[in-house]
């Protein structure tokens, strides 16, 4: 499922359009967070709202089958803050650093990792550039394809050697950290959609034809 920057607006869009999407559980969890945190509904009220939403919008909905799932979602939704981020800002210094790599695949990957790192920095002021996203997802969103699976780690090792990213010292932690974030430089780009970051980068440098739309995401994978 793509990253949603503004979950409040996305929840309101889903309610208005009645879109369950291909991952109903993810949709329900987002709506539950909205009902609990923005409409201040309790667990029981949230349960009823979610049940009504599914009855109205999910074909062949069986309330008995979904009862335990919706009850659990309604209970946990208050533990995870509803994200309300309109965009993340990219600076001239950051883009210049990426352009200096002079390899379009590496550039798209670095731009994607930078966007995720700055998103996580907005979510937590203690994040310090770390990217808690699956490597496979980063390559997918960056639109960087490799011939063999292990090639992904060769790419990352190259970027680490150049000092652009670093890895956790813990053997069981695959998270990476972007080391060239510079919030003091001039802001030259605002990113409000994480679906196609590789194409977003190409558009910015003038090599892309990707049309950026403002339509909100459906909760599709």
Where are these regions (language model features)?
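Modules that initiate DNA replication and primer synthesis
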Residues: 1-110, 114-206, 215-220
């Amino acid at each position: 499922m793509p990253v949603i920057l503004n979950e409040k607006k996305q929840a309101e869009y889903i309610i208005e359009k009645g879109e369950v999407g291909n991952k109903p559980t993810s949709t329900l969890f987002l709506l539950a967070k909205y009902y609990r945190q923005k409409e201040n509904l309790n667990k029981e009220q949230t349960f009823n709202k979610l049940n009504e939403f599914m009855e109205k919008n999910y074909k062949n909905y069986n309330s008995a089958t979904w009862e335990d799932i919706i009850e659990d979602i309604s209970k946990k939704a208050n533990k995870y803050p509803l994200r309300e981020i309109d965009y993340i800002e990219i600076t001239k210094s950051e883009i210049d650093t990426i352009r200096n790599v002079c390899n379009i695949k590496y550039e798209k990957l670095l731009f994607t990792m930078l966007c995720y790192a700055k998103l996580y920095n907005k979510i937590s002021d203690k994040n310090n550039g770390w990217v808690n996203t699956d490597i496979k997802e980063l390559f997918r969103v960056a639109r960087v394809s490799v011939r063999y699976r292990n090639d992904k780690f060769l790419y990352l090792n190259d970027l680490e050697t150049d000092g652009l990213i670093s890895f956790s010292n813990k053997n069981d932690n695959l998270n990476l950290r972007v080391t060239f974030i510079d919030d003091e430089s001039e802001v030259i780009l605002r990113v409000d959609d994480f679906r196609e970051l590789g194409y977003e980068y190409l558009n910015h440098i003038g090599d892309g034809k990707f049309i950026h739309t403002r339509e909100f995401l459906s909760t599709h994978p």
